[in-house]
Swiss-Prot record:
Family affiliation: Belongs to the AIR synthase family.
GO BP of this protein: 'de novo' IMP biosynthetic process; adenine biosynthetic process
Name of the featured protein: Phosphoribosylformylglycinamidine cyclo-ligase
Species in which this protein is naturally found: Methylocella silvestris (strain DSM 15510 / CIP 108128 / LMG 27833 / NCIMB 13906 / BL2)
HAMAP family, alphabetized: AIRS (MF_00741)
Catalytic activity: 2-formamido-N(1)-(5-O-phospho-beta-D-ribosyl)acetamidine + ATP = 5-amino-1-(5-phospho-beta-D-ribosyl)imidazole + ADP + phosphate + H(+)
Length: 353
């Protein structure tokens, strides 16, 4: 083989220079996420975090990882890449806060068939914005260019978050009991779950992402569906630190109430949810009608308007509701903890679909 015919990595579809240029471009975004314990510099073999500098005394580390499911397909097809990274952070850090943990640092994985530096940088910008909102340092990541595994401009994301909680403050507490109150915090929409069903409904309706959103005047359907997942850390962390009476938290993701509420309940206990208390966002009413989706299927697929659930003693509910309102939330009294029956999650009232 002559010098003229020798192959290079670039000939195989991997552009090392493009990857290095992207890393340089995102360094200012990453630095903006620095916090106590991390300088948020990237480029080394691993990210560093000084747990002592973060102020913990007897901490337990909590780790979570997640993705954004097929919501990423909408970002790819619309070319709107700047908020999907917020979703990625939210899905991970919300799983930390429900265990009482303060998010400390975050790492991401971005995989594509051919690296689009501008798209990747926009994704990382969203990740950095999510990290800032969650108070987590973005201390590292991996950008993988893998020709033959992803078609065209397709990419996928994974996130990894680590937090810490003092040993005595771990959630859920062991004293959750029948009669405790269930509170709900509003979601911003579908968050990052159920998008395979959403995309199927959109296709059946023969709608494009640039079509007007049937449920959101003034927005395109793609933009409305890309509304980022809420990050609940800034609301909940001060209340946890203040020992405001939160006994348990549940992040309402895939599986809805039936799958997620039992994860924080002791054996022998269930919960009754008052569906009429939920202010259901218009997106869910549209999905239910357009897709002929039953209320039961909606409840086991989507958050239906409640992205985070809290459990507290009845005596603490009034003060906790007031604190949540002072933090800018619109909490609802969602139900009560009950002795478990045949189904651990039961319902009263009806969803406003």
């Amino acid at each position: 083989m002559t010098d003229e015919t020798k192959l290079t990595y670039a000939d195989a579809g991997v552009d090392i220079d493009a990857g290095n240029a992207m890393v340089e471009a995102i360094k200012p975004l990453v630095r903006a996420t620095r916090r106590r314990g991390a300088d948020a510099e990237i480029g080394g073999f691993g990210g560093l975090f000084d747990l002592k500098a973060a102020g913990f005394t007897d901490p337990i580390l909590v780790a979570a990882n997640d993705g954004v499911g097929t919501k990423v397909r909408i970002a790819i097809e619309t070319g709107a890449h700047d908020t999907i990274g917020i979703d990625l952070v939210a899905m991970c850090v919300n799983d930390l806060i429900v265990q009482g943990a303060e998010p400390l640092f975050f790492l991401d994985y971005y995989a594509s068939g051919k690296l689009d530096g501008a798209a990747a940088a926009a994704v990382v910008k969203g990740i950095a914005n999510g990290c800032i909102e969650a108070g987590a340092a973005l201390i590292g990541g991996e950008t993988a260019e893998m020709p033959g595994l992803y078609a065209g401009a397709d990419y996928d994301l994974a996130g990894f978050a680590v937090g810490a909680v003092e040993r005595g403050a771990l959630l859920p507490r062991s004293d959750i009991a029948a009669g405790d109150v269930l509170l709900g915090l509003a979601s911003s929409g579908a968050h990052s779950n159920g998008f395979s069903l959403i995309r199927k409904i959109v296709a059946a309706q023969k709608l494009g992402w640039d079509a007007p959103a049937p449920y959101a005047p003034g927005q395109s359907l793609g933009a409305a569906l890309l509304t980022p997942t809420r990050i609940y850390v800034k609301t909940l962390l001060p209340l946890l630190r203040a020992q405001a009476g939160i006994k348990g938290l549940a992040h309402i993701t895939g599986g809805g109430f039936p799958d997620n509420l039992p994860r924080v309940l002791p054996q022998g206990l269930g919960v009754e949810v008052d569906l009429s208390a939920i202010a259901v966002p218009p997106v869910f009413a549209w999905l239910a009608e357009a897709g002929h989706v039953s209320a039961a299927e909606m409840l086991r697929t989507f958050n239906c308007g409640v992205g985070m659930a809290l459990i507290c003693a009845e005596a603490d509910a009034g003060a906790l509701l007031a604190s949540l309102r002072a933090a800018g939330e619109q909490p609802v009294a969602l139900g009560r903890v009950t002795p478990a029956g045949a189904e651990r999650v039961t319902y009263s009232g009806r969803l406003s679909l």
